């Protein structure tokens, strides 16, 4: 529940509250993955992006990857790939394209829009730079949703760093 409140804090611009959750309640034992805390790990990665720490994002998400793949956690996998793509993009690592393509392929297969659009302007420059050859009608709906999210979110997670 606290992780959800942290996400709300980020979206409403209360970054001090998000940082407090990170310091006091974010999972710390990344070497001993607790799959029941996957929402918390994803939230932790969001706060790390918010704080401008893309390297830490990758360390946080890496233990989740085998579980998500082996158990076919589609939505979690989309979030993991989008967050990883944003982190790689901010590090100027071209592997972001592979991660975003994987996220878009999965999201398009299930017609998920919100799972990607929630990242607003954090993902917008990636989407604009990626030549994705998937469903064009779905991508058009996705881009509209991403732009809408970008217009209403206050979080710095949505601000790309240069």
Question: Where are the predicted features?
Answer:
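Tandem amphipathic alpha-helical repeat scaffolds
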Residues: 1-12, 39-51, 79-90, 121-129
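TPR-repeat structural position
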Residues: 15, 54, 93-94
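General nucleic-acid-binding
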Residues: 93-151
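Conserved small/polar residues in nucleotide/adenosyl-binding loops
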Residues: 155-161
């Amino acid at each position: 529940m606290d992780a959800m409140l942290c996400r709300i804090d980020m979206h409403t611009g209360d970054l001090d509250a998000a940082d407090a959750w990170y310091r006091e309640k974010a999972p710390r034992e990344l070497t001993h993955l607790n799959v029941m805390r996957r929402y918390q790990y994803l939230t932790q990665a969001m706060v790390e992006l918010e704080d401008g720490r893309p390297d830490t994002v990758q360390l946080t998400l890496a233990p989740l990857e085998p579980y998500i793949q082996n158990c076919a956690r589609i939505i979690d996998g989309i979030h993991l790939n989008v967050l990883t793509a944003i982190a790689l993009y901010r590090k100027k690592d071209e592997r972001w394209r592979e991660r975003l393509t994987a996220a878009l392929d999965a999201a398009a297969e299930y017609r998920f829009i919100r799972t990607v659009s929630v990242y607003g302007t954090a993902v917008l420059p990636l989407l604009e730079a990626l030549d994705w050859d998937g469903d064009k009608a779905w991508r058009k709906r996705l881009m509209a949703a991403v732009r809408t999210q970008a217009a209403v979110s206050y979080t710095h997670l949505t601000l790309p760093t240069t």
